[in-house]
Amino acid sequence: MLEVVHIQKKRGKKQVLNDISFQVNCGECVAIVGRNGCGKSTLLQIMAGVLKPDQGEIRYFGKDARKDRKVVREYCGYVPQENPLMEELTVKDNLRLWAGTSREIERNVIEQFQLDELMKEQVAKLSGGMKRRLGIACAMLRWPPILLMDEPTTALDIYYKDSVWQWIQQYREKNGMVVITTHDEREIMGADRCLIMQDGVLTELEKNEITMENIRQMMDRLNEKGGNK
C-alpha cells in the first residue's frame, strides 16, 4: 500500500499542498487532475522522494520513504514531466543506468515500448515521443510495485498513448499501484479513482462517479479558476 499522510508544502507564502492525505492499494490506478500549476507535479515529486514536504509522510508498505532513500529505489518507479534522460548517451546506456546494473536488459520492456531499433541511437537525436517512451521504459526496468507518472502520454501520438495505457492495465493486473497526473479524459475514465486538486486541497470522485459528463463538467470548472504553482 502507498500512503500519503497529511502532506503540506509551501512555495514562498503560497500553500501549494494543504494537508493532503490518501492511499493507493495494490492493483489500483489513481488519476490526479487539476489546472496547470495547481500542485500536481509538486505532489508527485514529494511522493517520489525528489522533493521534501514541509510536513507529513509518504509510506511505502508502511515504511517512511523520507527517512530511507533505499525504500524509494526499491519500491518506486517515477516518470517525471521533464526529460530525466542522459542526452549524450545511447538508448541502451540509459536503460542500463536506470536498471542499476550492466546485466541483460529486460526484453519485454524493450519490446513493449518498441525500442529494439533505437538501442544504439543517441538520446539527443530522438523525437519527444521517443524520449517519452524511453523514460517510461527506464522507470519500469525493475518492475517496481509503485509507479508515479506525471503526464505520462505527453508528446505521444494516439497509437503510443493507447500502447502505454494498455501496458498500465497489464501492470495493474499484476498488483502494481499507479498514480498519474493527466488532462486526458480517457485516462481519467480508465482510473479507479480520480482526485481533483484545487487550491492545495484534494477532493475525490469514486469509480461510479467517473463518467464522461462529470469529467467534462469538472474540467470546465477547473479551467474557469486559477491554481497554485
Predicted features along the sequence, with ranges:
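The feature captures the beta-strand-to-loop junction immediately N-terminal to the Walker
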Residues: 33-35
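Helix-to-loop junction immediately C-terminal to a conserved catalytic motif
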Residues: 48
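Conserved ABC transporter NBD signature motif
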Residues: 56-67, 71-72
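Conserved ABC ATPase "signature" region
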Residues: 103-119
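Hydrophobic anchor residue at the start of the ABC signature
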Residues: 136
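Catalytic Walker B motif of ABC-type/P-loop ATPase nucleotide-binding domains
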Residues: 147-151
